């Protein structure tokens, strides 16, 4: 990598059409798990002007009123929940897949998949700075709308932050982009002033902008129509927003709309949990954890740890410690992280890894990891 480079990440508000589809899908998952912790759910949502479609596979002892869940979720995002025709198309999980997943004492992975977890020490959240700043902006947009700090704001919105690095250290913010839906008749200059005062300045208190930072607020001008009326929304289209802003590899599987037997979700959460504890323990400054699974198999077919040359121990020792310390089967990940509980909707906005109270964000394995790494490194050296 060059000595000097720029990294960029984006975020969206909970009223963004794609993210609202994710939220609806996770509300359906939660509604199923609330009554049946063993429910298998794969829910996709597509929405456009006047219509919302939820489709997928649900095998559960109790089925929720999905149209009611959808309308309630849309209302809570700031839109009219009764303004849409709702269509639900669901059926049970394929018996072939169910047989593969449930055939042994250990639940097998619901599909093959590759997932990545990442952590770095450049922010308190142990995430890349552009990711943290972009999510701060969209959180503040939603807060300003709900509290009516900026009364003209409507639910849809996006933000993007570019940070200049030198020798791997963030030095300055080179560009900030904020696009926010607003009521008709608002003067653009007034809106831009309000966003600068109530959104951008508070977001960058800890990492100030400079005179050369390019700040773009609603660069396209008028943004009155938003949400499903302006753009068709679909689950799984904000994968970089959900994870690490495109700054880390991604296996391609979406997080939302899936129960914990789907390793796209449980594996991604576990990989982040592992990486965060490695960095929190001081075992590395940066860490990428890679896991891969085969459908019907409980144990991963790949476990890789890359400390990017910053590790206190060798990557081999870190990998062996991870295999020893963490339960990497679907059952193990579900049990460790409480993924049989209705918790998913709470964490699906503003990135899945920015919520300090999420189970996969806890830094409670640092000491055992340190001990395991020391033992593994000693064993490697003795060979």
Tell where the protein language model's regions lie, with residue ranges:
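N-terminal, positively charged regions that mediate nucleic acid binding
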Residues: 1-40, 375
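Internal helix-turn-beta structural module
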Residues: 48, 286, 293-383
């Amino acid at each position: 990598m060059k000595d000097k480079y720029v990294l960029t990440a984006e975020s969206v508000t909970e009223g963004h059409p794609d993210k609202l589809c994710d939220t609806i899908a996770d509300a359906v998952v939660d509604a199923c798990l609330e009554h049946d912790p063993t429910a298998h759910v794969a829910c996709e949502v597509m929405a456009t002007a006047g219509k919302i479609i939820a489709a997928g596979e649900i095998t559960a002892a109790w089925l929720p009123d999905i149209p009611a869940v959808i309308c309630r979720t849309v209302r809570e995002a700031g839109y009219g929940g009764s303004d849409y025709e709702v269509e639900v198309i669901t059926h049970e999980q394929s018996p072939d897949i169910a047989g593969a997943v449930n055939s042994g004492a250990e639940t097998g992975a619901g599909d093959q998949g590759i997932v990545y977890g990442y952590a770095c020490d450049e922010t308190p959240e142990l995430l890349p700075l552009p990711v943290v700043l972009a999510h701060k902006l969209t959180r503040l947009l939603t807060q300003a709308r709900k509290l009516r700090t900026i009364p003209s704001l409507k639910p849809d919105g996006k933000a993007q932050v570019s940070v200049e690095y030198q020798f791997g250290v963030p030095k300055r913010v080179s560009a900030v982009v904020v696009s926010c839906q607003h009521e008709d008749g608002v003067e653009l200059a007034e809106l831009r002033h309000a966003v600068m005062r109530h959104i951008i300045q508070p977001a960058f208190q800890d990492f100030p902008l400079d005179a050369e930072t390019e700040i773009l607020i609603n660069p396209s001008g008028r943004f009155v129509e938003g949400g499903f009326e302006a753009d068709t929304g679909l689950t799984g289209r904000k994968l970089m927003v959900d994870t690490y802003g495109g700054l880390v590899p991604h296996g391609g599987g979406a997080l939302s709309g899936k129960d914990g037997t789907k390793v796209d979700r449980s594996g991604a959460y576990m990989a982040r949990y592992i990486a965060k504890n490695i960095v929190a323990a001081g075992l590395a400054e940066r860490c990428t954890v890679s896991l891969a699974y085969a459908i019907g198999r409980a144990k991963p077919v790949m476990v890789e740890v890359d400390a990017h040359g910053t590790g206190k121990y060798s990557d081999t020792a870190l990998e062996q410690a991870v295999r020893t310390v963490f339960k990497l089967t679907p059952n193990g990940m579900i049990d460790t992280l409480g993924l049989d509980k209705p918790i998913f909707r709470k964490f699906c906005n503003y990135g899945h890894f920015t919520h300090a109270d999420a189970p996969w964000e806890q830094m409670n394995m640092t000491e055992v990891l340190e001990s395991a790494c020391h033992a593994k490194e000693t064993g490697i050296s003795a060979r």
